[in-house]
Amino acid sequence: MENYQKIEKIGEGTYGVVYKARDLTHPNRIVALKKIRLEAEDEGVPSTAIREISLLKEMHDPNIVRLLNIVHADGHKLYLVFEFLDLDLKKYMEALPVSEGGRGKALPDGSTLDMNRLGLGEAMVKKFMAQLVEGIRYCHSHRVLHRDLKPQNLLIDREGNLKLADFGLARAFGVPLRTYTHEVVTLWYRAPEILLGGRQYSTGVDMWSVGAIFAEMCTRKPLFPGDSEIDEIFKIFKLLGTPDENTWPGVTSFPDFKASFPKWKREDTRKLVPGLERNGLDLLDAMLEYDPARRISAKQACMHPYFQAGSSAYSGRERLQPYP
């Protein structure tokens, strides 16, 4: 660790403390040091985790936060060295003026972002969404899932570009129920197949999270703010309707699905996200598709009409045929 000089603690992530630090081998380079707190610290760092993390160093995409180095210190401490970005999407949304649905909070000290110029209007939401799905497409094409996407791990640089952080960490270290400070890890962006106890899941879990984040960027409010797993499931069912074998073949076989669940009817997406253009509503529906086999992929999302110039009519639920 002699190559890094800690400047200040900047946060407490899912896996441990995050520090802003100076890279002493590169003049003027500021980095984020993520100290990974391992469950069994006395046993050292699992070799599987080291292997997984080493693969992430090979991932280079403008929409992903670069993993610059891995430092294995004292036998049982692991530090991940990332490029430094001082703002995440959650703080960005909170810094929006109250008149725009934000909370008017101050940006972190030292942030040079011009919120008045950037804001979070339709064009900015579309830009962030394009960068988000492109970053996910890149990761999925390298067989890397995120599994814990949320506004807190979408970082924004000083030019107002969005980058994904913490990709691949879930596979290396698991997704804990609580952070090391005993904070509950948020369920608001978790896909229904995980909430219902599914053991086999794929890239679709990330696309569900993107849908929930998309809606939140538009409305400035979380779409499914559950405070427990069952509350989260019911929040989803109340808005999207309780799924059955017709809407989601196989749903009744999930370990945590109960035939006694209340039967809610689906709300109109236009009411959930008022003001979103028709192509945006179409994309949101495709991301919040219950059946993971029919949920839009990141590659397909990149080519969605929402990201093209012009707009076409929103055709509602009947548009959602299985994606090829």
UniProtKB/Swiss-Prot annotation:
The active site is at residue 148. Keywords: ATP-binding, Cell cycle, Cell division, Kinase, Mitosis, Nucleotide-binding, Phosphoprotein, Serine/threonine-protein kinase, Transferase. GO terms for molecular function: ATP binding; cyclin binding; cyclin-dependent protein serine/threonine kinase activity; protein serine kinase activity. The modification Phosphothreonine is found at residues 14, 181. GO terms for biological process: cell division; G1/S transition of mitotic cell cycle; regulation of G2/M transition of mitotic cell cycle; regulation of gene expression; signal transduction. Residues 4-307 form the Protein kinase domain. GO terms for cellular component: cyclin-dependent protein kinase holoenzyme complex; cytoplasm; nucleus. ATP binds at residues 10-18, 34. Phosphorylation at Thr-14 or Tyr-15 inactivates the enzyme, while phosphorylation at Thr-181 activates it. The modification Phosphotyrosine is found at residue 15. It catalyses: L-seryl-[protein] + ATP = O-phospho-L-seryl-[protein] + ADP + H(+); L-threonyl-[protein] + ATP = O-phospho-L-threonyl-[protein] + ADP + H(+). CDD domains: STKc_CDK1_CdkB_like (cd07835). Pfam families: Pkinase. Gene3D superfamilies: Phosphorylase Kinase, domain 1 (3.30.200.20), Transferase(Phosphotransferase) domain 1 (1.10.510.10). PANTHER family: CELL DIVISION PROTEIN KINASE, CYCLIN-DEPENDENT KINASE 2. Forms a stable but non-covalent complex with a regulatory subunit (SUC1) and with a cyclin. Cyclin-dependent kinase that acts as a master regulator of the mitotic and meiotic cell cycles. Belongs to the protein kinase superfamily. CMGC Ser/Thr protein kinase family. CDC2/CDKX subfamily. This is Cyclin-dependent kinase 1. It comes from Ajellomyces capsulatus.
